[in-house]
């Protein structure tokens, strides 16, 4: 259901059913038994999260019955996670989801470990347990499960993310800096730069950590096989256009970033931006893009406008001569240039 219409209808039906169940005053144990069968056996995922959404209608007795049914099923299905039977795996997943709801509702960390951790077959389970603990404000437990996860999988990005978040929630920004820096070191990306900023600003030491981040990224750009893509990204993120330009022209960077940089410098440095557009034309023409000729004309138009405004028309004329000489055997392209009077 790509349009989402069926999902909306199911959600609406669930709401109506919940309200009707509350008004009908049905025996809570019978209601729990019936709803449990629907949630665990339906192929359309109808009436999901019943333990939470129908809490009022179920009442204490109904919720107890729901929990009992799920726990009984889990004893049978516990080891079916790798079963070849898809129906069995699906039912196990749904029962586990119900027991996770119960654990969250009861703020039961031990149960969360069992049903969210689910044997910790994958390192991501540690992050999931820590997140679930954080969701129910069990922050000490969240830190503990992050630490356990990192002991097993020190490179797991998600565990580091959760640890930063929980440290900040606990009012420990200085302790959040270590995992935040670990993540930044790996990618030097704007999202991790922002995560580092959040921790450092909370610890009132952003100036120091900002310098460290740029120094580290600059050092990486000086590597023998590296270009300045990551450094340019950070400077662009910080609106430091001239620093980005210097890094890009000295060490090179990804063409998409150079194009972004040219677009943002058009007003202040029109000739340099035009030069970027003109130099990008060969890449466009040598690609397999369907509309590469139209894109070439678009780049030429932008360069022409910028150079005319900067009284550098001769540069554009020279670029046209070279383009016609190099690609004169492309009649469709030549026709498009002729149509523009070039």
Residue positions per predicted region:
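Eukaryote-biased, non-catalytic alpha-solenoid scaffold regions
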Residues: 1-342
């Amino acid at each position: 259901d790509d349009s989402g219409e069926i999902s909306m209808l199911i959600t609406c039906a669930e709401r109506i059913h919940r309200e009707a169940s509350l008004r009908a005053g049905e025996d809570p144990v019978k209601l729990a038994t019936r709803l449990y069968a629907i949630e665990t056996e339906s192929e359309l995922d109808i009436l999901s999260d019943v333990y939470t959404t129908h809490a009022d209608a179920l009442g204490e007795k109904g919720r107890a019955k729901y929990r009992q049914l799920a726990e009984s099923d889990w004893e049978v299905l516990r080891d079916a996670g790798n079963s070849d039977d898809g129906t069995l795996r699906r039912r196990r997943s749904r029962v586990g989801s119900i027991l996770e709801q119960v654990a969250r509702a009861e703020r039961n960390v031990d149960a969360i470990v069992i049903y969210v951790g689910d044997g910790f077959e994958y390192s991501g389970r540690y992050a999931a347990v820590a997140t679930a603990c954080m969701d129910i404000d069990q922050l000490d437990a969240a830190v503990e499960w992050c630490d356990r996860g990192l002991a097993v999988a020190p490179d797991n990005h998600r565990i580091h993310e959760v640890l930063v978040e929980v440290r900040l929630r606990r009012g420990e920004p200085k302790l959040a800096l270590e995992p935040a820096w670990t993540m930044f070191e790996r990618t030097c990306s704007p999202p991790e730069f922002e995560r580092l900023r959040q921790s450092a600003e909370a610890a009132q030491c952003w100036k120091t950590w900002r310098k460290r981040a740029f120094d580290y990224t600059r050092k990486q750009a000086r590597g023998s096989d590296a270009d300045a893509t990551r450094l340019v990204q950070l400077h662009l993120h910080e609106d430091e256009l001239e620093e980005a330009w210097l890094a890009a022209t000295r060490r090179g960077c990804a063409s998409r970033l150079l194009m972004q940089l040219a677009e943002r410098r058009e007003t202040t440095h029109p000739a340099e931006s035009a030069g970027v557009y003109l130099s990008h034309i060969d890449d466009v023409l040598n690609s397999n893009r369907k509309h590469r000729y139209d894109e070439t004309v678009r780049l030429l138009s932008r360069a022409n406008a910028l150079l005319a405004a900067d009284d550098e028309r001769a540069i554009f004329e020279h670029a046209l001569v070279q383009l016609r000489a190099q690609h004169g055997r492309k009649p469709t392209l030549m026709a498009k240039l002729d149509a523009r009077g070039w």
